[in-house]
Amino acid sequence: MKVVAFERSVQGTGASRRLRNSGKTPGIIYGGAAEPKMIELDHNALWHALKKEAFHSSILELEVAGKSEQALLRAFQMHPFKPLVLHVDFQRVSANDKIHVKVPLHFMNQETAPGVKLGHGIVNHILNDLEVSCLPADLPEFIEVDLAAVELNQTVHLSDIKLPKGVTVITHGDDNPAVASISQPAGAVSEAAEGGEAAGETPAA
């Protein structure tokens, strides 16, 4: 995905406010061997790009003053109540250095999973993304979680997921976290419990 930016020479609160008033968003690109560079981007283009999942989890081609660099979106700041992007940070990436990125999970075959179709359960997304380590060339836009064989009251763990080649997951303590499950709706559980209590009641003498 290509992102066009321009060099920014003036910085400070006042300069940033004037920049935003002109339809631009201030930003910075840092990392690698080069010095950090102050940049500005078209606000509307950035606003629409931020709505795309791939913009947050893929290697971007960031063009500044006609020269392209590979970069990752690292952070962005939104206005508390206006639809306004206040600032954006990009990090340069090197083809030979591993990166740590949060990659979204895509849950496949949710409606046809046995636990949903036959067991009338609901799918619970315990995790919505995974932090991974890989080379830039191996970074996936998303990771699939296949629920095709998941029964009612079963849980899918990290070990059940087939990871793309060259990708490892950073788990922060739990080596095999739960990712998703299929369970009975809360109402169905309550009704079943009430039915059991009613069946066990003994008529008064």
UniProtKB/Swiss-Prot annotation:
One of its GO terms (molecular function) is structural constituent of ribosome. Pfam families: Ribosomal_L25p, Ribosomal_TL5_C. Keywords: Ribonucleoprotein, Ribosomal protein, RNA-binding, rRNA-binding. Residues 184-205 are annotated as: Disordered. One of its GO terms (biological process) is translation. GO terms for cellular component: cytosolic large ribosomal subunit. Transmembrane segments: none annotated. InterPro entries: Rbsml_bL25/Gln-tRNA_synth_N (IPR020056), Ribosomal_bL25/Gln-tRNA_synth (IPR011035), Ribosomal_bL25_b-dom (IPR020057), Ribosomal_bL25_C (IPR037121), Ribosomal_bL25_long (IPR001021), Ribosomal_bL25_short (IPR020055), Ribosomal_L25_dom (IPR029751), Ribosomal_uL5_bac-type (IPR020930). The keyword DNA damage does not apply. Belongs to the bacterial ribosomal protein bL25 family. CTC subfamily. This is one of the proteins that binds to the 5S RNA in the ribosome where it forms part of the central protuberance. Part of the 50S ribosomal subunit; part of the 5S rRNA/L5/L18/L25 subcomplex. Contacts the 5S rRNA. Binds to the 5S rRNA independently of L5 and L18. This is Large ribosomal subunit protein bL25. The gene is rplY.
